[in-house]
């Protein structure tokens, strides 16, 4: 029996919490039962549907915004161009320069807006969770970044020269290479994708758990506990609202960091023999 079939779904938002009990955050929220397609490699669960929905929404936004572009942008076109210019100027060109920034702009832009859209689901009512809180999407995005920066380095230098330039620190005594080469190898080819993946997942997972905890506690204090305990619902809902705004900051910060580090790793691969 598949894991999704063994775990019952608990939606921990205040809109679905049972009226007579309090549920603390659990793993059930991250492994909901399948919907629509119930078996095989194309099984769909709630998080997968959210992932598809947010991808469609962000694509639709840019299609509609740029459908009839004007010389002087306004409305949705203005918002879309500002967002695209932010990625182009502050990430791609800032790290890679204009020529290489233009070359890798599609990849960096795609990563940035996929992360933003997926993260945004964590504060949208009735969705209440980011697909990035589960390992699948961060793993795919980290793998994409990993493939791109290694491909770039191998294409420019060849496999062996690229690997050698990435892990051999020039100008150090020979005995130190026995210490530094393994460290550089692990840092470049293992820790880079691993930290990209874990940083994104851990931040969105922590944010989801905090919001669930505060709003579930608010529901419990106001509608379940009764009596004097209801007063504790006030600080819990204030904390929940405050952390919602903080989560909004984290949503964009994580997208920026992921896209920025992808650009940095591409830059390091392009100049592997200079580091």
Curated annotation (Swiss-Prot):
InterPro entries: ATP_synth_F0_asu, ATP_synth_F0_asu_bact/mt, F0_ATP_A_sf. Keywords: ATP synthesis, Cell membrane, CF(0), Hydrogen ion transport, Ion transport, Membrane, Transmembrane, Transmembrane helix, Transport. The keyword Membrane applies. Its main location: membrane. It comes from the Bacteria. It holds the Pfam family ATP-synt_A. GO terms for molecular function: proton-transporting ATP synthase activity, rotational mechanism. It is found in: Cell membrane. GO terms for cellular component: plasma membrane; proton-transporting ATP synthase complex. It is a multi-pass membrane protein. The chain crosses the membrane at residues 46-66, 104-124, 135-155, 166-186, 204-224, 231-251, 252-272. F-type ATPases have 2 components, CF(1) - the catalytic core - and CF(0) - the membrane proton channel. CF(1) has five subunits: alpha(3), beta(3), gamma(1), delta(1), epsilon(1). CF(0) has three main subunits: a(1), b(2) and c(9-12). The alpha and beta chains form an alternating ring which encloses part of the gamma chain. CF(1) is attached to CF(0) by a central stalk formed by the gamma and epsilon chains, while a peripheral stalk is formed by the delta and b chains. NCBIfam families: ATP_synt_6_or_A. Key component of the proton channel; it plays a direct role in the translocation of protons across the membrane. Belongs to the ATPase A chain family. PANTHER family: ATP SYNTHASE SUBUNIT A. This is ATP synthase subunit a. It comes from Rhodococcus erythropolis (strain PR4 / NBRC 100887). The gene is atpB.
